[in-house]
A protein has these predicted regions:
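A beta-strand signature from Gram-negative outer-membrane beta-barrel systems
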Residues: 1-36, 133, 138-140, 153, ...
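Short Pro/Gly-enriched beta-strand edge/turn motifs at strand-loop
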Residues: 2, 121-128
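Transmembrane beta-barrel domains of outer membrane proteins
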Residues: 2, 23-25, 144-148, 157, ...
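Short, glycine-/polar-rich solvent-exposed loops and beta-turns at beta-strand/coil boundaries
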Residues: 11-16, 170-173, 207-209
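Membrane-embedded beta-strand positions in outer-membrane beta-barrel channels/transporters
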Residues: 19-21, 140-142, 176-178, 282-283
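Surface-exposed loop/interface segments of Gram-negative outer-membrane beta-barrel transport/assembly proteins
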Residues: 29-124, 165-168, 176, 180-281
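C-terminal beta-signal and adjacent terminal beta-strands/loops
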Residues: 45-46, 130-132
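Outer-membrane beta-barrel transmembrane strands
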Residues: 134-152, 159-161, 268-283
Length: 283
C-alpha cells in the first residue's frame, strides 16, 4: 500500500487516497522447492424453487371446462350437449393424433360433469424440466511449485476448472499456466519475467425468453402429458432395433404446443460454444 508522497510521486492526484499494489505470487529467497496441491469438488443447484404447475388430471379437467364454455356460446348446443361434445373432443383437441395419456380404456377421461372418470390415471407424466437439467458438479485442481536460492526465485503453477451448469449441455472449462521467475544478475541489476496462459471453453444453450430453445421456458411450458419418448398405448416405451427409447418430436401436437420439437433430443446436437485463449507477459 502506497500512501501520501509515495503515491503522489507515482500517480499524481489519482493516488491522493492511496494506492494498493497487487503483486503476483512468487518464490521465496533461500527456500527449498515447495509443492502445493489443492483440489475442490462442489456442486450447484437452483436457489429458488420453480413454480408449481397443474398436473395432467387438473389440466384435462380445466381444458374440458374451456371447451364446454366455448361450445355453449354457440346456438347449436344446449348446456348438456356442449358438455357431451367437450368430453368427446377433449383428447383429440389436446393430443391430436397422439397417444391418449389415459390409455385406450378411457377414450373420454373426463365425463360430462367435468370430473375425471373413476379409475382413470395418467400412464406417464413427463418432467421436461428435469430432462433438460444435469448434475452441476464443479471440479477445480491447482498445482504450484515455488522456491529459490540467493539470486533466483521461481514460481510455477497450473490449474484446471470444470464447472458444469444446471442446464443440459451448459458448462465452463478453463486450463491455466503461470510462471514467475526473478533473477538477481548483479548487485545493481535484477530482472524478472512473468508469463501466463489461459484457455477457456464455455458451452451455453440459448437463453432468450422468446425462443423455444430456452430450457427454462420450455420446461415450464410443456405439459407432462406430452411424452419425451414415444409411448405405447399401455404406457410402455417404444424401442428401436437397438433397444433404445425413441424421442417423440410431437408431430401430432396441436398448433401452439411446439409440434415437431424435442429439446432434450436436440440440445446435445445444437452446440453453442465459445473458446478463448489469453496470453500475457511482463518483465
Amino acid at each position: 500500500v502506497l500512501k501520501d508522497a509515495a503515491s503522489a510521486a507515482l500517480y499524481g492526484s489519482r493516488g491522493a487516497n492511496g494506492v494498493i499494489i497487487i503483486t503476483t505470487k512468487q518464490g521465496q529467497q533461500d527456500s527449498k522447492a515447495t509443492v502445493k496441491v489443492k483440489a475442490t469438488l462442489g456442486g450447484s443447484s437452483r436457489a429458488v424453487r420453480d413454480y408449481d404447475r397443474v398436473n395432467t388430471n387438473l389440466y384435462f379437467e380445466l381444458y374440458w371446462e374451456a371447451l364446454r364454455n366455448q361450445y355453449a356460446k354457440s346456438s347449436d348446443y344446449t348446456p348438456a350437449t356442449a358438455a357431451t361434445q367437450a368430453s368427446k373432443d377433449l383428447v383429440t383437441k389436446l393430443m391430436g393424433g397422439g397417444p391418449n395419456p389415459y390409455g385406450t380404456q378411457y377414450p373420454q377421461p373426463v365425463g360430462t360433469d367435468g370430473k375425471l372418470a373413476a379409475g382413470a390415471r395418467p400412464l406417464w407424466n413427463s418432467d421436461w424440466s428435469d430432462a433438460m437439467e444435469q448434475q452441476a458438479l464443479r471440479t477445480e485442481l491447482n498445482l504450484s511449485v515455488s522456491g529459490g536460492g540467493k539470486a533466483n526465485q521461481y514460481f510455477f503453477s497450473a490449474g484446471y476448472l470444470n464447472d458444469k451448469g444446471i442446464a443440459l449441455e451448459s458448462g465452463y472449462q478453463r486450463f491455466n499456466l503461470r510462471s514467475n521467475v526473478t533473477s538477481e544478475m548483479t548487485s545493481w541489476l535484477k530482472g524478472s519475467i512473468n508469463l501466463s496462459f489461459a484457455h477457456s471453453m464455455q458451452n451455453y444453450p440459448v437463453s432468450s425468453d422468446s425462443k423455444t430453445s430456452n430450457v427454462i421456458t420450455a420446461g415450464r411450458t410443456m405439459p407432462g402429458f406430452y411424452p419425451i419418448y414415444e409411448m405405447n398405448t399401455d404406457g410402455s416405451y417404444k424401442l428401436d432395433d437397438n433397444g433404445d427409447r425413441i424421442y417423440d418430436f410431437g408431430s401430432y401436437r396441436p398448433s401452439g404446443s411446439m409440434a415437431n420439437w424435442n429439446l432434450p433430443a436436440t440440445l446435445p446436437l445444437d452446440k453453442s460454444e465459445r473458446m478463448k485463449d489469453e496470453v500475457s507477459g511482463r518483465t
